[in-house]
C-alpha cells in the first residue's frame, strides 16, 4: 500500500468536519507529508488544511527557512502561518524549543482542528531510547502514538509506521525540495548523537531493530493503558472534577505502588510534567506522609503541588501579594495583580456594593480612605459579638493557606472591613 493510500485510510477514521494544521519545518519529513496532504485535498476539496512554521531563531538560516516554507505553501495553495518563538537556553534548547513550539501552535489551533506532524518510525526509535536514557517508566517508554494529546493539543502522526527510506524515495520520485538543518549534524544534542552515531551501528547489527523497538513501545503503551483502566474507578472516587483536587484521606490503606500510580494519574489528568523518581519520592515523603498540621509544597515545572486538609492541589507559581496596598474610591473599578481580575466599588442605596469575580457584598458608605490589601493578621469581630483570630476565620471557611493572600481585603483607613465574599468585620 502506497503512502497516499495509507494516509487516506487513516484520515477516514476522523469525523468529516476535522480540520488539519500541519507542523511544517521545511525538512524532508514534513515536506513529504505536506505533499501527500495536498494531493488528498485535490481528491477531497472539502478537506481543511493549513500549515504552520515555527521560527525558533536558533540558526542564521532561520529566516530563509521561513521564506522557503511560505513559498512551498503558496505553490500548493495552502494557507501558511509563521510564528516566531524565543528560546531560553538555560532551560535546555531541545526541551524549551519543543515547549515553545507547542505553545505557539496552541495559540493558532482552531475548533475541530488537529495538529499533524511528520514523525516516522526512526523518530519513534530515538524517542524510545531517549526515554530509556532518562529512566522513564511505561508512560515514557510508550513513546509516540499515531493519535495522542501533548500539552493539551490533539496530535495526529500518520507517518509513524513509515521508514525514513520510504519518505526519501517518495521525495525523490516527486522531485520535492526541502531544507537541511545544519544543527542535525551537531552531536551535542542527544537525539543527533543517537541518530548519527549509535543507531547506524545498531541497524547494521540488527536490521529490524526499529520495528522491534516500535513493538516494545506499543507494549509499554498498552500496559500503561491497562493500568489506567484498572485504576479508573478508584481514581474517580478520590478526584474532584470541580476543583481538580485529589483526596489522600485513604491513601494509607493503599500500597505504596498504588499511591504512586494514583498520583501519576492525577498529574497526567492535569497535564503536569511527570516527576522524576527522586521528586516522586519527595512528594510521597513530604506531602503524602507529612503530619496533618503541615502544609507542604512541591514545585513541578511551572506548577506547585500543595496539600490542605487531606487534599492535594495544583496551582501556578503564585506572586507574593502580602505587601501590596491599592487605593480605590467609590464608583471605581481597578484590576488586581497576578490575574485576580477586576474589583468594583459602586454606591447603591446608601451602601457600597463590592463586586469581585462571582462575589458581591454590601458595606456601609464611608468618608475614610478605602484600601485593598491582601494580608491581615489581627482579630475579627463576628456578628455574634465576640472576636476571633483572622486565621481561625479562614479555617472556618475552609480557605487553603495560599488562597488567603489572594482574596482582596477591604480596609477603611487602617480598619479591616471585609474579606470579599467570605466574611466581614463587625467592629
Swiss-Prot record:
Belongs to the tRNA(Ile)-lysidine synthase family. It is found in: Cytoplasm. Pfam families: ATP_bind_3 (PF01171), TilS (PF09179), TilS_C (PF11734). The gene is tilS. HAMAP family: tRNA_Ile_lys_synt. GO terms for cellular component: cytoplasm. The keyword tRNA processing applies. Signal peptide: none annotated. It is an enzyme of class 6 (ligase). This is tRNA(Ile)-lysidine synthase. InterPro entries: Lysidine-tRNA-synth_C, Rossmann-like_a/b/a_fold, TilS/TtcA_N, tRNA_Ile_lys_synt, tRNA_Ile_lys_synt_N, tRNA_Ile_lys_synt_subst-bd. Its EC number is 6.3.4.19. NCBIfam families: lysidine_TilS_C, lysidine_TilS_N. GO terms for biological process: tRNA modification. Gene3D superfamilies: 1.20.59.20, HUPs. ATP binds at residues 25-30. The keyword DNA repair does not apply. Its main location: cytoplasm. PANTHER family: TRNA(ILE)-LYSIDINE SYNTHASE-RELATED (PTHR43033:SF1). Ligates lysine onto the cytidine present at position 34 of the AUA codon-specific tRNA(Ile) that contains the anticodon CAU, in an ATP-dependent manner. Cytidine is converted to lysidine, thus changing the amino acid specificity of the tRNA from methionine to isoleucine. Keywords: ATP-binding, Cytoplasm, Ligase, Nucleotide-binding, tRNA processing. It catalyses: cytidine(34) in tRNA(Ile2) + L-lysine + ATP = lysidine(34) in tRNA(Ile2) + AMP + diphosphate + H(+). One of its GO terms (molecular function) is ATP binding. The N-terminal region contains the highly conserved SGGXDS motif, predicted to be a P-loop motif involved in ATP binding.
